[in-house]
């Protein structure tokens, strides 16, 4: 179905506005009706991939763009022609802004990359953004930090977020936060030491279907949630699991919570399956490499006692519209954290997601034995 056509659910969401839509979805958002006298100044930081920059880091260009009021679509076509259609049809289409985007009280003021030339195109596409020559320079003029990492390994995360955390600035640190369990714990403990609100998670946490799933779980209407199966459509490789395996694990963590006991993973060619076990809950499943008829990136199945609930990121058949929605919810939650200084994601969940990913890799390396999470937690 063409999202530009009449879509009942989309029209319903649009007709009630962002606040009404989010109320229907069972989530809350800090109101944006009365902009602050001084807009929140956001500094974006781009992580590297093994020391190499990410010139069109989608976790900044796509995810964070709603935090800035202005986008020059002509400049976008010049610098990012591949993404022009997504921006014009969805991300910067006033018909699909959830009566909220771009936020009236936020501005991206600086873009930092270890290679300053990489930041220049972003400043031309989003007028008003400056190239930060150093983190120290950027931190003098921002109220919060967004560190985006689309495909990196996380080994540079601490160095990129620590200066802002040391100043107590609310910070988003992308996955895979810190790279390994020790790196994740180091960032979490540093943030806590400096009383700096920290957010780290997967955008899967904010899919429209996930919000419905959480509402079903919390209502108790369909009985106990007995099993979650979270699937990633892309073909599997072990290096890919270390980065993108975070997503299905985050789906399980979002629905079932922390307290994981052990993990076992098996692979066959370009697919893998991992079982995540709890001492007091039913085991759950992740699948990296599910075949698909239509690419929608992922699918999650919830098995309640009385109901099976299945969802993908798509809304009314449109992946791009659903992708737009989950990014909106992600940055809306970040904005709310900046305003309230209340962390939206428990630190234990963040730590256990990293541990699960690494325990699964350890399981695979050791003939797919069951690996206790304690073995990798240190």
What name fits each language-model region?
Residues 97-101, 130-141:
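Short acidic low-complexity segments
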Residues 314-378:
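C-terminal helical cap and adjacent loop that interface with cofactors, partners, or active-site loops
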Residues 177-238:
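A contiguous active-site-proximal alpha/beta segment in oxidoreductase catalytic domains
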Residues 4, 11-32:
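N-terminal export signals
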Residues 229-295, 348-355:
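Rossmann-like dinucleotide-binding domain that binds NAD(P)(H)
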Residues 142-145, 151-202:
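Beta-strand-loop-alpha-helix segment that lines the small-molecule cofactor/substrate pocket
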Residues 70-122:
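NAD(P)-binding Rossmann-fold cofactor-contacting core
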Residues 27-46, 51:
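C-terminal segment of N-terminal export signals and the immediately downstream linker at the start
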